[in-house]
């Protein structure tokens, strides 16, 4: 579950995006910032979180690093997070913002776990079937997990559709155990 604080900041940024008709653009920029801080430049993220660095220095760093990378809205948003000591919530804010954007665009994200990588055709076919079932636009990310042996396990929200060989074998094993004992 996403943090209440992160939700509030995400809602504020989303509202700004709605007012300026730029919710998608703001999300792409927010995603870019989070990727940069969590994957590319972890040290920069540590500096922004550090209590040893003054807030004015942190805001100057944000201005310098992101001067050409993102809009002033995202830079100012980051500066507010720095001012309020909320920069550590950035990843949760991104997740909360994505949920708001998905809700606006009638999208549900799902995961299809399979033993081998699914083809693009299979993923698209699964997305179409699930979109029809849920009356929403379903986007699927394929994750490979060799422990499921075969088949597909689909997770969408709190729902799980289990079509894996492992589960079928486990059920057979259970039934055999009942018969034998």
Swiss-Prot record:
Classification via SUPFAM superfamilies: N-terminal domain of the delta subunit of the F1F0-ATP synthase
Membrane topology recorded in Swiss-Prot or TrEMBL: Peripheral membrane protein
GO molecular function annotations of the record: proton-transporting ATP synthase activity, rotational mechanism
Keywords, comma-separated and alphabetical: ATP synthesis, Cell membrane, CF(1), Hydrogen ion transport, Ion transport, Membrane, Transport
Cell compartments where the protein resides: Cell membrane
GO cellular component, one term: plasma membrane
Keyword NADP: no
Disulfide bridge partners, by residue number: none
Signal peptide residues on this chain, from the entry's feature table: none
NCBIfam families, per database record: ATP_synt_delta, PRK05758.2-4
Similarity comment: family membership: Belongs to the ATPase delta chain family.
Task of the protein: F(1)F(0) ATP synthase produces ATP from ADP in the presence of a proton or sodium gradient. F-type ATPases consist of two structural domains, F(1) containing the extramembraneous catalytic core and F(0) containing the membrane proton channel, linked together by a central stalk and a peripheral stalk. During catalysis, ATP synthesis in the catalytic domain of F(1) is coupled via a rotary mechanism of the central stalk subunits to proton translocation.
PANTHER family in the record: ATP SYNTHASE DELTA CHAIN
Subunit structure: F-type ATPases have 2 components, F(1) - the catalytic core - and F(0) - the membrane proton channel. F(1) has five subunits: alpha(3), beta(3), gamma(1), delta(1), epsilon(1). F(0) has three main subunits: a(1), b(2) and c(10-14). The alpha and beta chains form an alternating ring which encloses part of the gamma chain. F(1) is attached to F(0) by a central stalk formed by the gamma and epsilon chains, while a peripheral stalk is formed by the delta and b chains.
Protein name: ATP synthase subunit delta
Gene source species: Clostridioides difficile (strain 630)
């Amino acid at each position: 579950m996403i943090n209440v604080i992160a939700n509030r900041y995400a809602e504020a940024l989303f509202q700004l995006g709605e007012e300026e008709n730029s919710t998608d653009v703001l999300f792409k920029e927010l995603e870019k910032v989070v990727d940069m801080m969590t994957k590319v430049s972890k040290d920069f993220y540590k500096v922004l979180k550090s209590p040893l660095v003054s807030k004015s220095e942190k805001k100057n760093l944000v201005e310098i690093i992101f001067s050409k990378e993102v809009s002033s809205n995202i830079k100012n948003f980051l500066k507010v997070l720095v001012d309020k000591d909320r920069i550590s919530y950035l990843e949760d804010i991104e997740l909360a913002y994505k949920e708001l954007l998905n809700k606006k665009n009638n999208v549900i994200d799902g995961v299809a776990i399979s033993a081998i990588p699914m083809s693009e055709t299979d993923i698209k076919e699964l997305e179409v079937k699930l979109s029809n079932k849920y009356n929403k636009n379903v986007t699927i990310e394929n994750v490979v997990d060799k422990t499921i042996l075969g088949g597909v396990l689909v997770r969408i929200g709190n729902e799980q559709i289990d079509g894996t060989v492992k589960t079928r074998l486990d059920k057979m094993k259970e039934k055999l155990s009942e018969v034998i004992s």
